[in-house]
């Protein structure tokens, strides 16, 4: 199973804002996506360059060949057309299933992006395992997700 994607992790530190990074599931590379804006800053500390580099890595993984894409979340940045939206789009264009999480705050934007291909899965291990098992069975019998009418290509884990 060739997995492309990114997972997010946050480290607590002395600053009130957490230090965030994305880790590539393909190569294990780590991308800092937050920046220190100095003491007292109330601005968003998202680091666009780190996000762009991480997104490009996923796109390259998809181009090399992937079976499934896992992206940490479809959030505010993606809803605005930035962030990891190009990675989502590359997976969609390659007819690859996507597993991600979506905040209720941007669910309408997610549904607009994914259309009828999205299916919400509850955020528990059993539901996610069931989705993955079903997808793997389809692959074993030679079916791609887009060959099955009505079979969602994107799975959403909702809070």
Spell out what each predicted region is:
Residues 104-118:
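Glycine-rich, charge-decorated loop segments at or immediately adjacent to ligand/cofactor-binding or catalytic sites
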Residues 87-104:
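Substrate-engagement module of ASCE P-loop NTPases
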Residues 73:
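Walker B catalytic acidic pair
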Residues 1-39:
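N-terminal phosphate/diphosphate-binding loop that engages ATP/GTP or pyrophosphate donors
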């Amino acid at each position: 199973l060739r997995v492309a994607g990114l997972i997010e992790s946050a480290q607590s530190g002395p600053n009130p804002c957490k230090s965030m990074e994305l880790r590539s599931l393909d190569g294990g590379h780590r991308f800092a996506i937050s920046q220190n804006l100095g003491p007292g800053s109330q601005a968003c500390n998202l680091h666009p360059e780190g996000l762009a580099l991480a997104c490009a890595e996923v796109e390259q993984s998809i181009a090399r060949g992937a079976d499934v894409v896992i992206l940490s979340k479809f959030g505010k940045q993606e809803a605005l057309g930035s962030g990891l939206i190009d990675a989502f789009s590359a997976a969609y264009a390659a007819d690859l299933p996507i597993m991600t999480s979506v905040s209720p705050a941007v669910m309408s934007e997610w549904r607009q992006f994914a259309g009828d291909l999205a299916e919400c899965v509850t955020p528990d291990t059993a539901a996610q395992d069931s989705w993955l098992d079903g997808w793997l069975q389809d692959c074993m019998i030679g079916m791609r997700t887009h060959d099955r009418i009505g079979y969602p290509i994107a799975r959403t884990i909702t809070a």
